[in-house]
């Protein structure tokens, strides 16, 4: 297969489809989403059979247990895909919304209209349910989509793609609105991220290596985050009961997510009081502690933290702990070592909370809440295509609105500029 020619054809079809889906009304888009859900429900056996092929290949190729778990399509995960499609169909359609319309001294009205981005390329690994999540959000926001899943999920993704095509057909939309790349050749990724004539934005979802490569080589804008090095800072003015529950939940509710706390910062005046309680709670959960020298004076059972620990995304039951002198040191540490993802302060001081919100340079900053809330669903977005730590266009969880941009609209009645 000539990968360059194949990807150019896919891109050309996506560009044409983007003009159709951009002007599709909400009812048509919702019809496609519901029909896709019905097609998935009717194709459960086919989906499970295709997934079984991928799992068999994965085991033969030595995929570890975590990757195999992400790859597996269980009945519950199929149920979740169906539920997700219905949820996206129920979300308000952002396309065409006009905001900020106001009269200017000249008599014209000026406002902003929300419009689709155009063609969105999604590159992801392992999890076949991302195929449905990404396709549904792009479809509802009026974008055409090119999906390139991991080679380990090729059979699952193609089976899901057939269901999506069925849903599009039912709604009278062309299959090219959502295209799933049919080759496992890695050269397809290189082509996809270097086609600015056909692709408007790339959203990578996967490991740090994949995202670094795409960020380095892409010739189209990328919506991404590299790491989730999230912090909780327990201030001297914190309610220590709140601090205990927030610090435990932020770390142990789930270990493998990008919004899990990886470093705990504790204000020196409360360290001797709160750290032993936290250590006991973490021990019950099997969490390994790595602390600075001052932490180890209080918790001698903790391992010695090294410089690399402060910027490490463990995605595991491991936690770095540092005792800091004050809020200034906590903010400086977060801005230096953090990944600009999600950081929280536990404090009863209004002024310190406001300083934290203002000075911590992250896409989500929190007061007295677990970092695990950094999620599109929890933020009321309904669903998310990913989380961005960039500052341009989308920042934080990216939902339907993040898959659109705005253009100015000007309304006049024969007005001319004097």
UniProtKB/Swiss-Prot annotation:
- Signal peptide extent: none
GO MF terms held by the record: glutamate-5-semialdehyde dehydrogenase activity; NADP binding
The record, for CDD domains, names: ALDH_F18-19_ProA-GPR
Kindly name one Pfam family recorded for this protein.
Aldedh
Record's GO cellular component, any one?
Answer: cytoplasm
| Catalytically driven reaction(s) | L-glutamate 5-semialdehyde + phosphate + NADP(+) = L-glutamyl 5-phosphate + NADPH + H(+)
Which UniProt keywords are given for this protein, alphabetically ordered?
A: Amino-acid biosynthesis, Cytoplasm, NADP, Oxidoreductase, Proline biosynthesis
**Enzyme class (EC, first level):** oxidoreductase
Record GO biological process: L-proline biosynthetic process
The UniProt record lists the EC number as 1.2.1.41
- The question of whether Transmembrane is a record keyword is answered with no
Q: In which pathway does it act?
A: Amino-acid biosynthesis; L-proline biosynthesis; L-glutamate 5-semialdehyde from L-glutamate: step 2/2
Q: What function does the entry list? A: Catalyzes the NADPH-dependent reduction of L-glutamate 5-phosphate into L-glutamate 5-semialdehyde and phosphate. The product spontaneously undergoes cyclization to form 1-pyrroline-5-carboxylate.
Family membership noted in the UniProt record: Belongs to the gamma-glutamyl phosphate reductase family.
Q: What is this protein called?
A: Gamma-glutamyl phosphate reductase
Native organism? Hahella chejuensis (strain KCTC 2396)
